[in-house]
A protein has these predicted regions:
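Membrane-interface helix caps and helix-loop-helix hairpins in membrane proteins
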Residues: 30-40, 60
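Transmembrane alpha-helix/helix-exit interface in multi-pass inner-membrane proteins
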Residues: 62, 66-92
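Interfacial loop-to-transmembrane junctions
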Residues: 133-157
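Juxtamembrane boundary at the C-terminal end of a transmembrane helix
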Residues: 162-179
Length: 179
């Protein structure tokens, strides 16, 4: 019995690694070559959607769910950036000189503290939290721990985005966005 549990755990970890690798590869491609073009972010990140959709019914279910959950988180972030008006800062920040980029990133962060963008940001965060909670509770049509894992991936997006915003406000040079 322990051998099967250990084997299943190893299989699950391998599957999660495959899903993470798909997300990581897409991010590397975008941030490495196309980062100045925010309109390309989601299409590049979605390169493996056909493979992931096919994997939902087979042994790669965890990998596919991880990748798709990460993609949904990315879509939520991009939508919130567009809705708050901060997307307009993106090309300037990532193409600015090293001495100008932190100032531009800080300006983008402070833009989010204005009333309308802040309300939009809070509503967006609440919607993501509610979606994550729903996935976690009833597994959103998933079986076993897959729904909980999808919820964790989605909610982790909020943590990462929140830390990035905090960094942009307090110490823009440490955000990881500026080379």
């Amino acid at each position: 019995m322990c051998i099967r549990d250990s084997s299943q755990t190893t299989s699950d970890l391998g599957s999660l690694l495959v899903g993470f690798s798909g997300s990581w590869l897409a991010g590397c491609i975008f941030w490495g070559w196309l980062r100045a073009h925010p309109v390309l972010h989601l299409p590049v990140e979605a390169f493996a959607v056909p493979v992931a959709l096919g994997g939902l019914q087979g042994r790669w279910r965890l990998a596919a769910t991880f990748y798709l959950s990460s993609l949904v988180g990315t879509a939520c972030t991009d939508l919130a950036m567009a809705a708050t008006g901060v997307m307009q800062f993106w090309p300037a920040v990532v193409t600015a000189s090293l001495d100008q980029a932190p100032l531009l990133l800080h300006q983008a962060g402070t833009h989010l503290l204005q009333p309308l963008p802040l309300i939009t940001l809070v509503i967006s965060a609440v919607l993501v939290l509610l979606a994550g909670r729903r996935l976690s509770r009833n597994s959103g049509g998933f079986t076993g721990d897959v729904g909980s894992m999808a919820a964790a991936v989605l909610i982790t997006t909020l943590w990462v985005d929140g830390l990035f915003l905090l960094s942009a406000l307090l110490q823009p040079g440490l955000s990881g966005l500026i080379e």
